[in-house]
Amino acid sequence: MANLVDTNVLVYCFDPRSPAKQAIACELVRQGLANRQLVLPHQAIVEFVAATTRPRFDLGGAPLLAPQVAYREAEDLLRNFSVLYPDEDVLDTALRGVSTLGLSWFDAHLWAYAEVHGLPEILSEDFEHGRHYGHVRVVDPFLVAANEIHELPPMYDTADPEQDRPPSNHDQNPSSR
């Protein structure tokens, strides 16, 4: 099953300021392209262009990519990956993510793509690694590749839904039967 990729993974492919993350991101994207296991939300492509063309103080005011190069890279992403676009379900789910999960609008929108489209994981360093949001688990590929994380929490076990169910009033008051 495919996983959703956040903007930061795409940007690190072109960011020389962190060679280790650059290598991890490039390999992740290369493998995802080869085995068709990565899906991009349209939001990641829009954010990719904005992030890579923004002037960087620590690069002497230069962007990571010249605008024309960033546009070509964005076109390549569109051609080579499955891209998800927002619809009413994604927007409704994103609103729920903001109100019930406390996510920022952009993070909620990203999560909503995965939740609505049944994608099990989001690959991102911007969420809490290993945390489950609804049916989606977040994986920080940079922590995993750096061996800073040894084990991910298991996905929700649906074999016995009663096991983790909080007690109801009915369970606490046997005389109500």
Indicate where each model-derived feature is located.
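Short, well-structured N-terminal submotif of metal-dependent ribonuclease cores
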Residues: M1-L40, P55-V69, A145-E151, Y156-S176
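Short beta-strand segments at enzyme active-site cores
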Residues: V39-Q43, L123-S124
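Glycine/small-residue-rich phosphate/adenosyl-binding loop
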Residues: A44-I45, V49, T53, L59-L78, ...
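Active-site neighborhoods of divalent-metal-dependent phosphate/nucleic-acid chemistry enzymes
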Residues: N80-L123, D157-P166, H170-Q172
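Acidic, metal-binding active-site segment of PIN/NYN-like and related structure-specific nucleases
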Residues: A108-H150
